[in-house]
A protein has these predicted regions:
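C-terminal output helix
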Residues: 40, 58-67
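Sequence-specific DNA-binding recognition helix
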Residues: 119, 165-202
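The C-terminal output helix
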Residues: 68-85
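Receiver (REC) domain active-site loop signature in two-component systems and cognate sites
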Residues: 7
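Active-site beta3 strand of CheY-like receiver
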Residues: 1-2
Length: 206
């Protein structure tokens, strides 16, 4: 969203506040444009969660570059999060609705990843929102739909087990430990995600 600070009916500050306070829209990048050169207004804008604050006059190419950089950074952060399941990789603003949402999602998986019965329906119920909203929010914040997020979290845990293990654990045991009922399916998913077989890093095969 690109908005001017000074607008009729609703100014840019109020619009950005409403956007950032609504869970369905809080992830959307917000760029504030203004002819008012004010350190106070700029600080207030960033406190609300505005992503960029540009003073007029400005070069349109600079605006395009700022937008491109924001989107590129978000794609980079999503990729880093996918391979770590670490909330900090997303660089979400502290004390924001987005940070609360994704932290809750990761904490639920941290608590339940070993439970093979912990499925998408239970996850959505525990998140406390509709399936449509949770799925849209997960894709917007992480680039992953719910099911993929849950599977990737389990695979990341499995990789840590392999990396930190002593080599006396087999593939089947790891699969069951992270909530997979089928070791063959686990191996297939692991290979697709990390590019190597889990057994190649173990002392013995499952």
């Amino acid at each position: 969203i690109v908005s001017d600070l000074m607008m009729p009916v609703m100014d840019g500050m109020e619009l950005s506040r409403r956007i950032k306070e609504n869970l369905a829209t809080s992830h959307i990048p917000f760029l504030m444009l203004t002819a008012l050169r004010s350190d106070v207004q700029e600080k207030r804008s960033f406190e609300i969660g505005v992503d960029e604050y540009l003073c007029k006059p400005f070069d349109e190419e600079v605006l395009r570059l700022r937008i491109r950089n924001i989107l590129n950074l978000r794609r980079k952060y999503k990729k880093m999060f996918s391979s770590s399941s670490n909330v900090e990789e997303l660089h979400v603003k502290e004390e924001s609705r987005d940070k609360t949402f994704i932290t809750n999602a990761v904490n639920l998986m941290k608590e339940h990843y070993a439970d093979a019965e912990y499925n998408l329906e239970r996850f959505v119920r525990d998140m406390g929102y509709s399936k449509t909203l949770v799925n849209k929010k997960m894709q917007d914040l992480t680039g992953q739909p719910i099911g993929q997020f849950m599977k990737n979290y389990r695979l990341n845990v499995a990789q840590r087990i392999i990396q930190e293990g002593s080599g006396d654990i087999n593939v089947s045991e790891i699969a069951y430990a992270v909530g997979f009922n089928d070791p063959k399916y686990f191996t297939k998913c692991f290979k697709e995600f990390f590019g190597y077989l889990p057994s190649s890093k173990l002392g013995k095969k499952g």
